[in-house]
From Swiss-Prot:
Annotated Gene Ontology cellular component terms: plasma membrane; SNARE complex; synaptic vesicle; synaptic vesicle membrane
CDD domains recorded: R-SNARE_VAMP2 (cd15870)
Superkingdom in the source lineage: Eukaryota
Species, as recorded: Drosophila melanogaster (Fruit fly)
Polar residues composition bias: residue spans: 1-16
Coiled-coil spans in chain: none
Topology of this chain in the membrane: Single-pass type IV membrane protein
Main location: membrane
Family membership noted in the UniProt record: Belongs to the synaptobrevin family.
Protein name: Synaptobrevin
Length: 152
């Protein structure tokens, strides 16, 4: 019996296991599976390259986004500083406006007092000039009642 033949049913073989065909030639295995493995490797490498390209694209986008976030943070800091400066300037303006308002109120009050005093002085002058003086009425040259005796 040759190695390629199946065992006889009578069991003339020393063991009860069937005889297996010889393993394929190593060169035959490479030719059958090598081309398939190379194709699989090429496909895997292509997928890997595509994935790497996508990762590189995402990394680039993320870098741009991080730069934008940093720029935004810097602009917000500058805006906050400007807001603080404007608030301080507004506070100073409010204080100065209050002082100026009080100063103008006092100036207006002084002017009203001066005008009031001038008006009182003018009124006194007018009253004195129109009212006869007390010295004129006591000299006898004033209004005397004329009495005449009846003619006889």
């Amino acid at each position: 019996m040759e190695n390629n033949e199946a065992p006889s049913p009578s069991g003339s073989n020393n063991n009860d296991f069937p005889i297996l065909p010889p393993p394929p030639n190593a060169n035959d295995n490479y030719n059958q599976f090598g081309d398939h493995q190379i194709r699989n490797n090429n496909a895997a490498q292509k997928k890997l390259q595509q994935t790497q390209a996508k990762v590189d694209e995402v990394v680039g986008i993320m870098r741009v986004n991080v730069e934008k976030v940093l720029e935004r943070d810097q602009k917000l800091s500058e805006l906050g500083e400007r807001a603080d400066q404007l608030e301080q300037g507004a506070s100073q303006f409010e204080q100065q406006a209050g002082k100026l308002k009080r100063k103008q109120w006092w100036a207006n009050m002084k002017m009203m007092i001066i005008l009031g005093v001038i008006a009182v002085v003018l009124l006194i002058i007018v009253l004195v000039s129109v009212w006869p003086s007390s010295s004129d009425s006591g000299s006898g040259g004033g209004n005397k009642a004329i009495t005449q005796a009846p003619p006889h």
